[in-house]
């Protein structure tokens, strides 16, 4: 019985919807008929005469005020639309029209299969957007105390955002802590130090951890029970405390290197001890994993210190040894540090060998991989490349390969060329980057701009060819050429990672919606009319009457019809009518 009632209601609802969709004219005439029947009880004639009398008594000042009010409202709508577009990247009116008005007008299909498919598609796209908008740690990140803080002292600007530093704190807690830290007082202090927001509190905690370790290091162990001989046993130093001091307290790279060497001595001892005990239980295994992360981090930062201090060959050797010793730790992306150091040495054959290993279709790409490959291809032809000669004779095979490599790199990250060509000013790179985003472009160009300048003609080739990439991908948010479509979320994530004084590069460049342009034009036009009418009422009245006479004249209607017919003939390419021929008998 309930099912029958439900079916009847569904049929009634569908009939009403059908009647409103296809029989709107019938409803319209019914309303007109009711108005005509009820014209006497409703006193429609009297009301119309009252309204006409009221309109006749209105002065021109009322119309001027009305026009000014509409102009003010249009201006407020324009300001709101512009703010909403800058914040969310879309028009508010357009979004409301598509999201709310379109379903009411019957623009949504009610088929359950389509709904299920769309929901699955939405979940897939959301999953893809989450993976594409993953934030990565910058493998070439600077030192806070020796580089970021010195920039703040000189300029008074903060180069790092709170969001970026919060991500670094989470990384430190993941890499440098484990569940057994509470058993060792120094590690327990450092576990709290990594969660501190105040830099001075973190530095004080690191010093406290080293002092506690120094006090507890003198443990008296009797060698023989009946003897008075004692041994002084030194406990291992806290390696993570030295890491924090090297990163945040050291004001020069040389000071940071000294602290990292002390951290290496302490971390290497902890790593060897935990390596022997890692199979004794899950607790020892977690401790060994933590000690491995600490040791790899220290060695990588020592190699970066050597690179900063000009000992590039030593840095390359340290990076190669580290990659051989820990080949599975790809989270640090040490190969990108190695590529930058090899480019500094101009060891292009070694760079090509590293690219052959890491520029694989199964491995995640980066701007360093793609643009370094493009630089090597451009190096072979850039010194002799000329756009005029290429336009006359065409591109050779080597030039075509170089152009394709540049197009591939630009498709992966379209923000990099503006920094390499110095069309946008560089800032200090953040500690975290977003693949294919503006943050990654800054991090790459900050270290690799000198390598592009060193190759003669490379920047000229990039300048002549990089914009051709966009012709191959006219809709980058929907379909890519060699990579997945460009993720939509990069702009929002980059604004969180980059400081407020930097103008975030947006791709693809959003154009102002039609609603904003229309509102701006309408607002300006009505404001101008209101001002002119208020200042010159008689002249504007004569002008309005003249315009009405022109639009209502027969000559204007004839000219408009002729222009319309001529335009139709041009578009349809209607041939002229053949002329009649007269034959004489």
Curated annotation (Swiss-Prot):
One of its GO terms (cellular component) is membrane. It is a multi-pass membrane protein. Its main location: membrane. Keywords: Glycoprotein, Membrane, Phosphoprotein, Transmembrane, Transmembrane helix. It is found in: Membrane. Glycans are attached at residue 47. This is Suppressor of tumorigenicity 7 protein. The modification Phosphoserine is found at residue 386. It comes from Felis catus (Cat). Belongs to the ST7 family. It comes from the Eukaryota. It holds the Pfam family ST7. The chain crosses the membrane at residues 15-35, 62-82, 512-532.
């Amino acid at each position: 019985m309930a099912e029958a009632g439900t079916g009847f209601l569904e049929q009634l609802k569908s009939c009403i919807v059908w009647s409103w969709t296809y029989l709107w004219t019938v409803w319209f005439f019914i309303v007109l008929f009711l108005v005509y029947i009820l014209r006497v009880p409703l006193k429609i004639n009297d009301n119309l005469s009252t309204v006409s009398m009221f309109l006749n008594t209105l002065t021109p000042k009322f119309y001027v005020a009305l026009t000014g009010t509409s102009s003010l409202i249009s201006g407020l709508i324009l300001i709101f639309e512009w703010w909403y577009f800058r914040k969310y990247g879309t028009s508010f009116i357009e979004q409301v029209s598509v999201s709310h008005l379109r379903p009411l007008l019957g623009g949504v299909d009610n088929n359950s299969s389509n709904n299920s498919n769309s929901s699955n598609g939405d979940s897939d796209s959301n999953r893809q957007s989450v993976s594409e908008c993953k934030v990565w740690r910058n493998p070439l990140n600077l030192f806070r105390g020796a580089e970021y803080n010195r920039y703040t002292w000189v300029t008074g600007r903060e180069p790092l955002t709170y969001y970026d530093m919060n991500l670094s704190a989470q990384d430190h807690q993941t890499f440098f802590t484990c569940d057994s830290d509470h058993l060792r007082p120094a590690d327990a202090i450092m576990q709290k130090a990594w969660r501190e927001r105040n830099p001075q509190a973190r530095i004080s905690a690191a010093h406290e951890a080293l002092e506690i370790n120094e006090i507890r290091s003198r443990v008296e162990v009797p060698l023989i029970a009946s003897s008075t001989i004692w041994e002084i046993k030194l406990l291992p130093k806290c390696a993570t405390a030295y890491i924090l001091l090297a990163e945040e307290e050291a004001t020069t790279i040389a000071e940071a290197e000294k602290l990292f060497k002390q951290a290496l001595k302490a971390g290497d001892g902890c790593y060897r001890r935990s390596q022997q005990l890692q199979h004794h239980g899950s607790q020892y295994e977690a401790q060994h994993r933590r000690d491995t992360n600490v040791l790899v981090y220290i060695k990588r930062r020592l190699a970066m210190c050597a690179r900063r201090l000009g000992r590039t060959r030593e840095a390359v050797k340290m990076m190669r040894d580290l990659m051989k010793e820990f080949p599975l730790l790809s989270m640090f992306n040490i190969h990108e540090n190695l590529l930058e150091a090899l480019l500094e040495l101009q060891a292009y054959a070694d760079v090509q060998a590293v690219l052959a290993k890491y520029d694989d279709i199964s491995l995640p790409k980066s701007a360093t991989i793609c643009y370094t490959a493009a630089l090597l291809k451009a190096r072979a032809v850039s010194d002799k490349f000329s756009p005029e000669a290429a336009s006359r004779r065409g591109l050779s095979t080597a030039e075509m390969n170089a152009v394709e490599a540049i197009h591939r790199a630009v498709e992966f990250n379209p923000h990099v060329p503006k920094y390499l060509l110095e069309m946008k000013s560089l800032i200090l790179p953040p500690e975290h980057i977003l693949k294919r985003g503006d943050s990654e472009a800054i991090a790459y160009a900050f270290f690799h701009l000198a390598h592009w300048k060193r190759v003669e003609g490379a920047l000229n080739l990039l300048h002549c060819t990089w914009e051709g990439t966009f012709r191959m991908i006219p809709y980058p948010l929907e379909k890519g050429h060699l990579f997945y479509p460009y993720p939509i979320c990069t702009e929002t994530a980059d604004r969180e990672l980059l400081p407020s004084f930097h103008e975030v590069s947006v791709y693809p460049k959003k154009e102002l919606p039609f609603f904003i342009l229309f509102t701006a034009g309408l607002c300006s036009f009505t404001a101008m009319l209101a001002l002119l009418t208020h200042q010159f009422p008689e002249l504007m009245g004569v002008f309005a009457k003249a315009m009405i006479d022109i639009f209502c004249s027969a000559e204007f209607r004839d000219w408009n019809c002729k222009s319309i017919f001529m335009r139709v003939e041009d578009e349809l390419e209607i041939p002229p009518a053949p002329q009649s021929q007269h034959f004489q008998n």
